[in-house]
Amino acid sequence: MKSTFKSEYPFEKRKAESERIADRFKNRIPVICEKAEKSDIPEIDKRKYLVPADLTVGQFVYVIRKRIMLPPEKAIFIFVNDTLPPTAALMSAIYQEHKDKDGFLYVTYSGENTFGR
């Protein structure tokens, strides 16, 4: 899944921004959250997040759900490097394992209707 954030900003600018964030916010993780291309789930209002290092993947999914005002009958899935991270994993662990060379963690979200409507 390709990132529109990456295509809009050159590597040097992204790298400089993530380094500035890391210097200012020691216990926060810079995350870029974008909707999967062919998903019918709503678009998110912002894609840059500074999440607490001790936030779980499940808690981050909850944040996304609220921001896109996803109805309860819809499911949401997040992917990091095309894999589904464990819900109980800490965002800091996911970041250490999957962060991009530019210093951001790229998360893609997608949804499907769990009740067949």
Curated annotation (Swiss-Prot):
It holds the Pfam family ATG8. Changing L55A: Impairs autophagic activity. Changing P52A: Significantly decreases ATG19-binding and autophagic activity. Induction: Up-regulated upon starvation conditions. Expression is under the control of UME6 which acts along with a histone deacetylase complex including SIN3 and RPD3 to negatively regulate ATG8 levels and subsequent autophagic activity. It comes from the Eukaryota. It is found in: Cytoplasmic vesicle, Cvt vesicle membrane; Cytoplasmic vesicle, Autophagosome membrane; Vacuole membrane; Mitochondrion membrane. Keywords: Autophagy, Cytoplasmic vesicle, Lipoprotein, Membrane, Mitochondrion, Protein transport, Transport, Ubl conjugation pathway, Vacuole. One of its GO terms (biological process) is autophagosome assembly. It is a lipid-anchor; Peripheral membrane protein. The keyword Transmembrane helix does not apply. Changing K48E: Impairs autophagic activity. One of its GO terms (cellular component) is phagophore assembly site. Conjugation to phosphatidylethanolamine (PE) leads to homodimerization. Interacts with ATG1. Interacts with ATG3. Interacts with ATG4. Interacts with ATG7. Interacts with ATG12. Interacts with ATG32. Interacts with ATG34. Interacts with ATG19 (via the C-terminal 10 residues). Interacts with the endoplasmic reticulum to Golgi v-SNARE protein BET1. Interacts with the vacuolar v-SNARE protein NYV1. Interacts with the UBX domain-containing protein SHP1. Interacts with the vacuolar membrane protein HFL1. Interacts with ATG45. Present with 2010 molecules/cell in log phase SD medium. This is Autophagy-related protein 8. The gene is ATG8. Changing Y49A: Impairs ATG19-binding, PE-conjugation, and autophagic activity. One of its GO terms (molecular function) is phosphatidylethanolamine binding. A lipid is attached at G116 (Phosphatidylethanolamine amidated glycine). It comes from Saccharomyces cerevisiae (strain ATCC 204508 / S288c) (Baker's yeast). Ubiquitin-like modifier involved in cytoplasm to vacuole transport (Cvt) vesicles and autophagosome formation. With ATG4, mediates the delivery of the vesicles and autophagosomes to the vacuole via the microtubule cytoskeleton. Required for selective autophagic degradation of the nucleus (nucleophagy) as well as for mitophagy which contributes to regulate mitochondrial quantity and quality by eliminating the mitochondria to a basal level to fulfill cellular energy requirements and preventing excess ROS production. Has a lipidation-independent vacuolar function to facilitate the degradation of vacuolar integral membrane proteins during early-stationary vacuole turnover (EVT) when cells enter stationary phase.
